[in-house]
Each structure stands twice: as C-alpha cells, then as structure tokens.
Amino acid sequence: MIILIIPTIVEKNYEGHQIYDIYSRLLKDRIIFISGEINDDTASLVISELLYLDSINHNDISIYINSPGGSVTAGLAIYDTMKIIKSDVETIGVGMSASMGAFLLSSGTKGKRSILENAEVMIHEILGGAQGQATEIQIQADRILHLREKLNKLLAKNSNQTLKKINNDTKRDHYMDAEEAMNYGIVDKILK
C-alpha cells in the first residue's frame, strides 16, 4: 500500500492562522492539477474546481497536466467544461501528457498552452475492448470508431493540423518532446 502525504501550508491572516492542504492553497491562486489516470473521479474534481473558480471571477485558470490519459468520456467532460466557462484556461504540460492528457493539454485557450522544456507528449488512437455477443461487439466497435473520429477532429482543430495527418499520426503511439509538441501545435510555447 502506498501512502501519499499531502503537504500543508500555514498562512497568517487577520484572524490568526489558516491551514491549507497544498492543493487547496494552489486553488486559491486558480491552479488545478491533473495527475495520474483521467477517470470519472478526476473529472468530477476538475470540473467542480473549474466551475467554482469561474463563479468567483473570470480571471485565467491554470491546469497543470501530468497524466498517462484515461477515460475518453471523463476527458471530454473536462474538455466541455473548459469550453463553456468564461475564464480562459491556461494548460501546462509537465512530465508526460499522454493520450487524453495530451488532448486536454491541446485544449487550453490558444496562446496560453505551454509545456516545460523536459516534458513530453504522446498521442495515439483511442483504446477499447468489447466482449459479448457479436451484435454487442459491433455496437462497441462502432462507438470506438465514432469517438476516434470525434477526438481526431477536435485534436486537428486544436493543433491546426489536417485531419488526415492526425489520423495517420495516431495510428501508433506518437511521442513528442517539448519542441516537437510546439511545432505540432499541441502547445504554443515552451517554459524554460
């Protein structure tokens, strides 16, 4: 069993002292982290944070992404929320932004998508599996193809690449360093 210790921060204020866990303190500065697998729990947390911050004011919100990817539907829920709020969303790739992590990195407000100089990005075709009767397998296969087309169109729009190039590049794992990710259009700048 891995025990994760979350640091706390003590701040002095007019009432004395306020204790925050590190993530809550950073949230005060409009900073959100997506780390690890993107799943329904991650999506609920990130969506709640985005909506909360947007309800306070419409200043920029920063999302740091270090994720191997995960659920397409959970990722699209985060994406849709990023698009409906009034605040600009700055995305910053740290470590590895792969699969849905790369998609979310590319989905920040244009001009406000960054990557650290030693971070990496990986895009690929969505993964899925099916079991059951032939009809059920066909339904799942059709759904996977539909989601692939949807994600590839969105990634093409985000990166200003052609759909043909995205379709070709996502057939296999396609890794990019920071410079390549910037040239590809996933991000706009490298933070050094």
Can you name each region flagged by the protein language model?
Residues M1-K192:
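Terminal-region recognition feature
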